[in-house]
Amino acid sequence: MKGYVHQFESFGCADGPGSRFIVFLSGCGMRCKFCHNPDTWKMKDGKEYSAEDVLKEALTCRSYWGKKGGITVSGGEPLLQIDFLIELFSLAKEKGVNTCIDTAGGPFTMENPWFEKFKKLMEVTDILLMDIKHIDETEHIKLTGLSGKNIIQMFRYLDEIKKPIWIRHVLTPGITDNDEYLTKTRDFIRTLSNVKRVEILPYHGLGAIKYKDLGLDYVLKNTPSPSEERVKNAKEILECEKYTGWKD
């Protein structure tokens, strides 16, 4: 089976435990206002690779991974190519490779046949990096263009099967840095028993040039990065120091 790949990154240190080989898949249904990779939105803009070829490429970097590293598949939204993911990760596990998915959870549904595929994928997935775009449903739709209800459902399911997750939240002034919303996000995280790490990602506008190149309007072009004080405040509210997984 072939998948649509946007690009590879041979040495990533912020996308899962240890050093990682990152596979960025093409295709995403969300249109997050702070997205810095709009060039990944269209699936067929990516280059076709077989799962075998992707794994072969990744394994050339295996000597850098150490005991904790491995492969992270990001995007775009990797769950849009779930069949390809299953094949890639199944091959990776045959080689003893640690597997991680970086996802916003947008495609998740408990309806079959997709859900049966997802359960199969979880059998060969070690860790998930998951975004909480916005805890408020109305604001989530404004921010991403899609509902977040199924994403909450995905969090609940992953907790049920005890699959380790690493939660990330993009802190964007005027959109996701409201203390009330941060507190609600914290309260939701507290209901989950499988959270190993919580991380704040300060918003930046470094992707603005890509929007210009693609002829797209970048609606946050006048939005500044959050101050150190607001980042510290968010970390305290979300109790980031409480979650110590993969920090050593």
Describe the function of each predicted region.
Residues 1-25, 29-47, 60-67:
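N-terminal [4Fe-4S]-dependent radical SAM core
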Residues 2-13, 166, 171-248:
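Auxiliary Fe-S-binding modules of radical SAM enzymes
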Residues 16, 34, 43-46, 82, ...:
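Generic domain-boundary/flexible-linker signal
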Residues 39-43, 141-147, 215-223:
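Short glycine-enriched, charge-decorated loop/helix-capping segments at active-site entrances
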Residues 48, 145-148, 225-228:
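Short, conserved loop/turn and helix-capping segments at secondary-structure boundaries
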Residues 59-63, 67-70, 75, 79-201, ...:
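Conserved AdoMet/S-adenosylmethionine-binding subsite of the radical SAM
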